[in-house]
Amino acid sequence: MRIEVMIKGNSKEICIPLIKETTLEDIRELSEVEVYDISSGLNAYAILKNSTVCLEYSSKLYEMYIAIFLKMLDDTATSKEIMSDMGGMEPYSLLEVGLINAFIEALIWRVEQGEVVGRYEAFVEDLCRKMSSNLLCEIVSWKQEEDIMNTKFDYLLLSLRLIVMMVEYKTKEEGEIEKKSTFAFAKEYFYKAFALLGETKDLEDDMAFVFRASLTIDALVTRQVAGRISEVFPIVEDLPISKKNMFGIYIQMAEVCMSEDGALNDLLYSVFTTSCLVSLDTGYGNEFVEVLIAMVEQDGGSGGKRIGNVMETFRMIFHSLQDSESRGRERLIWNFLSFLSRIRMGRDMGDLNSIFLKFIVKYPETIELYSNFILINKIDFPLHTLHGISSFGFMKRFYSVLFNKVRKERHDKAHVDKLISEFLKFFLATKNKELIGILPLVPYIPSKREVLYVLYEIYSFLFEKEVIEHVGLFLLKTPALVGISSSIYYNVRYLRHLATRLSLVDVEPRMVVFLGIVYYCESKKLYNFNYTGILEYIQDEDGIRMSRDGLVGVIELIHSGYISRSHEFTLSYVNSLLTIALKPKTIETTLVIIEIILRRILEKEEKIIFMKGIHQRFQELFVLLSSKRFLSDEVSDSYRRLYRSIVERIKCAPNFYNYVVLCLADISFFDGEFPRGHFKSFNDLYNHTLSRMGVVEGFPDIFMVDHGWSCSENTDKAVSGPFLHRVCGSGKEEETKPRETKSHNMYDIIRTGTNDSVMSLESSTGSISLHSSAPMPSISRKAWLEMLDEGIRKREKSVSWLIDVIYTRRSQSSTIRTVLDLLKLRLRNKFEYEDLYILLKAYNILSIRENDSEEFLKHALHRGLDFKTDPAICYKLSMETNGFYRFFFRALHLAVSNLPCNEDLSFPERTQLVSRFDTADLVHIQNTFKQKMVQKLLERSRSPSYRTYFFNVDSLGVIDSLTIIRRLDDPSLVSRAFERLRESKNEMLFYVPQLVQMLRYKKVFEMAFSTLKELAKDEYVAHQLIWNLKANLYVDGRAAVNNYHGTFVRCIEEIMKEMPDGSRDIFLKEEEFISSLTKISSELTPHLRSSKDEKRRRINEYLSRIKLHPGIYIPFYPDLKIIEIVNGSARALQSHSKVPFMASFRVQDPGGQISIKQLIFKSGDDCRQDMLALQIISMFESIFKQANLDIFLYPYKVMATSSGTGIIEVIPNSKSRDQIGKENINNLLEYFEYKFGFKESEGYLTAICNFASSLAGYSLVGYFLNIKDRHNGNIMIDDQGRMIHIDFGYMLEMSPGNLNIEAPLKLTKEIEELLGGTSGKGFEIYQELMVKGFLALRRRSKDLVMMVDSFVDSELPCYRRNAVENFILRFRFELSDKNARRFVLSLIAESSQKFRTWMYDQYQKITNNIAF
């Protein structure tokens, strides 16, 4: 289908054929074309025209129209043809109107972008011809569909916008428009639009635009601007339209007025003599005034061609307002003066000033406007002439407003200087007290010499009237009165009160005033972080000469109460003082004053003395002072005393102190006393100090190099040799330079690790702060700290140097944040007391305390004793804490130091505990320290307890649970205890005897039995339970049935019943094997009197008959499988009435390793008591290990397999003391020399240490368990010299023959001789371990007491009356740690070589043939 589109071109009609109807895709493709020429442009235009009949109107289509037209208009020929066709088109359909609108909008956009609108004159004239009154009426009447009417209205508005552009262009370029008839429609539109304003609310904005556009067109074309304005202006404010549209009309009037001479003057008169501005909102009114100001100033800048004599208009307005009697007169005056106050005229200032002066006195509220007028126009005539027409009260108000504006706004400084000088002179001339309140409002005070004299006289007046306290801010702004002291000739009175206040004696009156100015002004300024005035005064030779010692005293008085509220400010101040002191020409009095100031400041600001640069500058100063030939010795000595006090105070940072002493300070300051330490030579100390300072200053960057991070070019040099030597140089560091002063909240800075004004040691030292580091890889803060800690642990054994980092770099908030975070990370990963001390020390140095410090302190509390802890660290921790923790760390120091203590540690008050600790903490404290006060607190809180020990119900141990089950009546707590047992299956093998005892209590039997069956699901636990149940069936061997016989038998049957078949078979084979072995002992009883060889033959014969099944294991070592009974290994053991024997077994561990294990089998003995004793000894051993105590115990294994039978582990590589004696060795000393070599050999000394360690362990065991029957037959010595006790048949309240003849500890003469006598080194080791072990056991007594208590109802013979109570008494809780130490030493002394020990040994010799 062929389609033809006709285009009425500029000269002829053009027919464009199209092959198809236009689609939206066609339009989209056209919009993407970059450039059009005449041919492609007309074809594209034809497609656009065709789209008006093929497509539906949409905003997207309209946008593409505009885009296409903008590109077409780039080609002049194409644009002419299109404008010709468009000019003849009548807007009928929706898309036709839309196409025309898009073209007009494209034209407007190009004009707005700078294109000359005259290029489109013909098209604009065509638009004017279409602007008929019918079009406007048709739109207003809204007779057609909404879409077409909206589009037509857009057509009208766009057309008027383009026509206005053309009229404004023609007026500007040609002055007058010739084709006036073309634009005649504007007058009709102007009146119709005016009539329609307010009637069409929905179209108000658009009709207001039509009105403004037609007004502009008509006024500019007809050249009747003034007439149109005078016609419209009076009635605009009465129109029922919005303020916005009213404002738009006023603005349009103003802009039109600029096209006609004198028109703007008429508008100005109308605006400011009518309620025009009042009718507008304040915002629109101010904006309108700004437009008028811009027009007046613009015309003024061009010589006033348009406005003419605007000043005459201002006068007319002034007279009109002055004569006005309307009620809104004040508002009109304010509007007019506000307008004048913002104009920069540059001429007629006197006339404008007269207008203001005639109004402001009557209307004081306009003072602010007058002030603005003065400032922006730089009025420079004497303002105090205002006083002639006003009162002092008015002047006070005027200057207050004026100075307030100067403070808030930027104005010409030279002009403001004049204003301030004029005021000060006015104040001095009048000396009126009403004006004193204005002095603090002065924005600043010029430092001109003539002003300084005026200031002197003003202060003289203020001091005389004693009103100096009322001018606070004036003091801050007063410049130093330098250079005028000798030329002050004013006759002033002697102000006694001022002289007394400043402690001035024999000072002439004029200098009293001068020094008063110095004191009051500089004190105020210094408090507000400004020391510049002080620096000027102390260098003012004229002032020093005239005031003599007065200035020295006043400066000292200023600094007497100095408080450092900003480290940066104080550091800058100190550096500035040292800079002056280091000037070669600085006079002696100035040096005296500087020394006084430095002493005062450095007493208060500790951070500065830890800065290397300060020490370097002091050394430079001492060199300079020594070169001053006429300087008095007293001045030099005062500086030396000052520096000595500084060096004494930096000793708390040992690395930094060493560095200062070795690398910076003059050696004469130390009088031959140098830093001490573990160093081989002075050179060793020197190199170590440099290395430490390299770490201190390079932290943290130097530890990140291993991770591939090079935070700065100096990082690798941080600890290198040449670099370290360079550190000693005298180059000034950046840290010593004066900095901008700023006060900070230290806690907030450190908490966030940020500080905009942070000072880093980025200097010749090569140390780099985090602020200066290169960007870090994108990792978390925690990961970065982990890497840092890893780097430190690889290189450093200790981080004590972090204290030096805190002292020397505390101004670098990011570094301090890193130190704190690092320490907390280390404490969480691996708790060390040293790290805790450094963290707390850092908090105290920085005067902060973060919440997590309590977390780490509580960790230390619950950690218990650790004897590997450095005692010095414990003491230091006590110094960094208070309240309970001071007591705790002091007690820890006493325990681990092994030093005599004369200090009585007092437990803290109740309030400190209640406020700081929760119940769980108090439970731990009570169980550790056994304090009556804590006990009462816990009793009031109803915390569960037994025998004054309390339970933490949220963290129950196994022995806690067992005790609660037996002793407490709280059902919920008992249930929780059983639940805890079921959760602790891995620990149950150890507690099997206690689990069995639990069955004796009827109130909990069912739950106990249920729990046992649950635990018996573990195969080996089940085996141990059955054997132990069998061991408890009878009272004594098999003589009498136990009261619980039936109960225990039932339990055995139930456990066996619930065993899987395979597990039951394994147990039966194991039991058969064990029974066959223990049976041998009972079968040998008839042969008790046979020879040893005969007994041995019979035992081996029995053993050879025993069948060994696969999977048989050592009962107390389930992992050791027995693969063979060693042939001929058995032998009978010595016993008075029984025949125990020992046999060897070849066993295999899970790894396949084969070894020999020796066991003893007994029959006729109750082994349960030995089991209990060795359980407790095992707990002793665990406590010692956890406390890092080198105390040896060997809790060998014993297991009762039934009533009266048992198996005992043989202690390998050991002999009894009795056996040693029978080998013709007279004493232990002789044996040790024979066994381990010469007394001074390493092997011998090691054996002595081992012996002392084991002797301490078993002495404590013997003391606490009250073990008796200690003779040479049950004391073993192994091949490393360690003593091991066996056979615990007599303990607690049981002794042989009920005779208690043994000493508390077995310390024979031969033991003392072996240890070198009571003063020997070995004996000292023994005593030290005894004391430490005793204290360690006291701190962990709860579990031990509960373990002893667990067998109270077992009917064991050792449990006689008060057995548990006496066990508790042996901890001596009534003694402090200090007195407990004394008690242990007295116990040792009491047992040493006692007759009771010798007597018992003799008893054993007679009764059991045990000679030694």
Swiss-Prot record:
Pfam families: PI3_PI4_kinase (PF00454), PI3Ka (PF00613)
SMART domains: PI3Kc
InterPro entries, per database record: ARM-type_fold, Kinase-like_dom_sf, PI3/4_kinase_cat_dom, PI3/4_kinase_cat_sf, PI3/4_kinase_CS, PI3K_accessory_dom, PI3K_accessory_sf, PI_Kinase
Chief location category: cytoplasm
Record-linked Gene3D superfamilies: Phosphatidylinositol 3-/4-kinase, catalytic domain, Phosphatidylinositol 3-kinase Catalytic Subunit, Chain A, domain 4, Phosphatidylinositol 3-kinase, accessory domain (PIK)
Any one annotated GO CC term: cytoplasm
Domain PIK helical: 878-1055
Region (G-loop): 1133-1139
Compartment(s) where it occurs, according to its Swiss-Prot or TrEMBL record: Cytoplasm
GO BP term (any one): phosphatidylinositol phosphate biosynthetic process
Segments forming domain PI3K/PI4K catalytic: 1127-1396
Entry annotated with the keyword Magnesium: no
Cytoplasm as UniProt keyword: yes
EC number of the protein: 2.7.1.67
Entry keywords, A to Z: ATP-binding, Cytoplasm, Kinase, Nucleotide-binding, Transferase
One Gene Ontology MF term: 1-phosphatidylinositol 4-kinase activity
Region (Catalytic loop): 1266-1274
Disulfide bonds: none
Segments of this protein annotated with the region Activation loop: 1285-1308
Catalysis: reaction(s): a 1,2-diacyl-sn-glycero-3-phospho-(1D-myo-inositol) + ATP = a 1,2-diacyl-sn-glycero-3-phospho-(1D-myo-inositol 4-phosphate) + ADP + H(+)
Spans annotated as Pleckstrin homology (PH) domain conferring phosphoinositide binding specificity: 1056-1163
Function description: Acts on phosphatidylinositol (PI) in the first committed step in the production of the second messenger inositol 1,4,5,-trisphosphate.
Family note: Belongs to the PI3/PI4-kinase family. Type III PI4K subfamily.
Name assigned to this protein: Probable phosphatidylinositol 4-kinase STT4 homolog
